[in-house]
């Protein structure tokens, strides 16, 4: 099973110590009552991986680890087999001892787009909400973060994260907890909070923005990345049963409307820092994620539209500050 004891010890004497009033009981209840039916298989794959200490570690330009002496073919095949047990891999990519995990999303492209607009992450305590496999947590560490904490209730992502951590030498500068943001108390303890690809899945987007604000210190920075539509501050798309074949998409505002939402929730210095269509090069089917991907969700007669006739995915990133 996953041992969160190191994380508890790390936060016991810092600004996150208040979290320990509820967190150990929450995670004990999760391990007792809420494990996914395949969790033991996934966790077994993690446990069977060797604990490696990389001779070469690059988290600044990617998530890349290498040994001083290349792994034998048998070692590489064994590690890759365990990693493939944890498919599908959606967020990455990872380069681990000669094994290329070519994930569905080129999450490194998103990082390249947003990083120039962020306040320096060096020395910061960071929360990444809906962090997936934790790819961006490692990039935050590479940018100098003191501590990067990710939360995501999807248990496969937790096992993917722990697998990567084990191959990175057990690095304790990043942690992933199997929680949703609604399970966090108002900690007001993070210097930077990220929410990327989450807002449109929330039934109440303003509540989500307040939850993000409640995690920030005064003066802290929010990076919000989400789907938007073209339009003025009065426009939002409320899809029907599906959007790009996703069932759980509730609100897709225009960028102008989302700026108003952020301001209404009490954020200041709100600015749009990036907006671009999602391409089939950035999100696609790979050998590590073999089911349908973006190309299958667009109208083959007009790729500017989804199969349902809505505008194709357009993603925008915003930076805002808590007063």
From Swiss-Prot:
This entry's Enzyme Commission designation comes to 2.5.1.-
- The enzyme's main class, written as a single word, is transferase
Native species of this protein? Edwardsiella ictaluri (strain 93-146)
Binding residues for carboxy-S-adenosyl-L-methionine: 91, 105, 110, 130, 181-182, 196, 200, 315
Catalytic activity reported: carboxy-S-adenosyl-L-methionine + 5-hydroxyuridine(34) in tRNA = 5-carboxymethoxyuridine(34) in tRNA + S-adenosyl-L-homocysteine + H(+)
Q: Which UniProt key words apply to this protein?
A: Transferase, tRNA processing
Question: What InterPro entries does its record include?
Answer: CmoB (IPR010017), Mo5U34_MeTrfas-like (IPR027555), SAM-dependent_MTases_sf (IPR029063)
Q: Which domain of life is it from?
A: Bacteria
What is this protein for, i.e. what is its function? Answer: Catalyzes carboxymethyl transfer from carboxy-S-adenosyl-L-methionine (Cx-SAM) to 5-hydroxyuridine (ho5U) to form 5-carboxymethoxyuridine (cmo5U) at position 34 in tRNAs.
Q: Write down the PANTHER family for this protein, in alphabetical order.
A: METHYLTRANSFERASE, TRNA U34 CARBOXYMETHYLTRANSFERASE
The UniProt GO MF terms for this protein read: methyltransferase activity; transferase activity, transferring alkyl or aryl (other than methyl) groups
Which family is it part of?
Belongs to the class I-like SAM-binding methyltransferase superfamily. CmoB family.
Q: What name goes with this protein?
A: tRNA U34 carboxymethyltransferase
Single GO biological process annotation from the record: tRNA wobble uridine modification
Known partners and oligomeric status: Homotetramer.
Write the gene name: cmoB
